[in-house]
């Protein structure tokens, strides 16, 4: 049975231990120590990584009463080894995990909702609650969570007796067999949890609720995405730098960038509408200039948008008995095409057309569209002579 040092001291970064077993399993080795501060995956928190001597530990799991350390090369059983935890990774996970307990405890106290799903990923933490929470309610929960952090409340862990547990009100997402470990955050939360936590709420640093969405599975409720501590700080630094760049680009104050972007979007919509109107007028004018023919029409254009190109084709087919084709692009980059006809089933003709212009595409009997890599001269020669 491995002695679990992480329950004695969640902040233990280094320790010595004796290797009691080492066995190969595929392309990795599994090491068991007589005692360990490496936390195995559990309670929603990933297993620790670090070093046993000079050997890299890339994951840890619990198997029965033993903690399995996964490494890439063997260590002799009986060896006494110096071990190091990847502390930055562990501490960030503890910050996020304890922060999750704070938020879940506040939501449960305030609204009676239960945490029914928790995932600590490599970039964010998500919590699923079985009730709806508005943006205003989540903002209030975030504010209260940060007050709990600022008040430096104690975080206590203990193993209650069966009788004590019977009289204890605590949160738990599932039925637990065997001895239950309790994590209690002073005046905030009492929850069953097997993972290591910070010693006081001040160590959490900060709590940021980043977003929320309706739960996709498992009934009604909300999923929130959050970060705490150093991970939250790193995220805020990126956001702040981006906001500074936006403020400089738009010549706006840092606290007025959203309004500046909204104005830019509004102006852009007006310009898009004006551009679409001009493109439409130009397409109609260009179609008007086309000379009617009994054969095919082939046009090239680099100005019109897709809607206006379609309009140009629709207007041009009225002036020919064959196909009306419009190409947009260049010999260097290739072309996109739209081809229409009143008299030819283009769905059937598409294969022959694509073969002639090194293209690919399809559509309806009246209109096809796609792309091609043939050059301008070859496209013109093929389309003008094309019959089906």
Predicted ranges, named:
Residues 1-388:
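A glycine- and charged-residue-rich anion-binding loop/surface
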């Amino acid at each position: 049975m491995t002695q679990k040092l992480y329950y004695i001291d969640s902040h233990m970064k280094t320790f010595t231990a004796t290797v009691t077993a080492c066995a190969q399993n595929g392309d990795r080795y599994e090491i068991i120590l007589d005692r360990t501060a490496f936390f195995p995956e559990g309670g929603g928190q990933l297993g620790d990584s670090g070093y046993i001597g000079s050997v890299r530990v890339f994951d840890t799991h619990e198997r029965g009463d033993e903690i399995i350390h996964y490494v890439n090369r063997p260590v002799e059983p009986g060896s006494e080894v110096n071990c190091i935890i990847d502390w930055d990774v562990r501490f960030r996970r503890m910050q996020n995990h304890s922060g999750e307990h704070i938020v879940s405890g506040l939501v449960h106290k305030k609204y009676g909702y239960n945490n029914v799903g928790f995932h600590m990923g490599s970039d964010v933490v998500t919590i699923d609650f079985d009730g709806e929470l508005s943006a205003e309610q989540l903002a209030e929960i975030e504010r209260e969570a940060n007050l709990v952090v600022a008040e430096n409340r104690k975080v206590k862990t203990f193993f209650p007796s069966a009788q004590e547990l019977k009289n204890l009100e605590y949160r738990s997402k599932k039925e637990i067999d065997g001895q239950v470990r309790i994590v209690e955050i002073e005046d905030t939360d009492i929850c069953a949890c097997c993972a290591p936590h910070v010693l006081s709420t001040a160590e959490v640093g900060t709590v940021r609720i980043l977003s929320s969405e309706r739960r996709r599975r498992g009934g009604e409720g909300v999923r929130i995405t959050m970060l705490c501590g150093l991970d939250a700080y790193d995220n805020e630094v990126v956001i702040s730098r981006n906001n500074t760049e936006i403020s400089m680009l738009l010549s706006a104050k840092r606290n007025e960038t959203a309004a500046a972007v909204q104005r830019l979007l509004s102006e852009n919509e007006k310009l898009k509408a004006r551009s679409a109107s001009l493109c439409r007028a130009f397409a109609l004018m260009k179609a008007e200039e086309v000379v009617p023919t009994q054969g095919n029409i082939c046009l090239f254009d680099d100005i019109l948008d897709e809607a206006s190109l379609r309009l140009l084709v629709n207007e041009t087919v009225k002036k020919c008995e064959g196909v009306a084709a419009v190409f947009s692009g260049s010999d260097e980059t290739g072309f996109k095409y739209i081809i229409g006809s009143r008299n030819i089933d283009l769905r059937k003709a598409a294969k022959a057309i694509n073969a002639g212009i090194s293209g690919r595409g399809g559509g309806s009997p009246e209109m096809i569209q796609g792309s091609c890599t043939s050059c301008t001269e070859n496209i013109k020669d093929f389309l003008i002579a094309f019959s089906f």
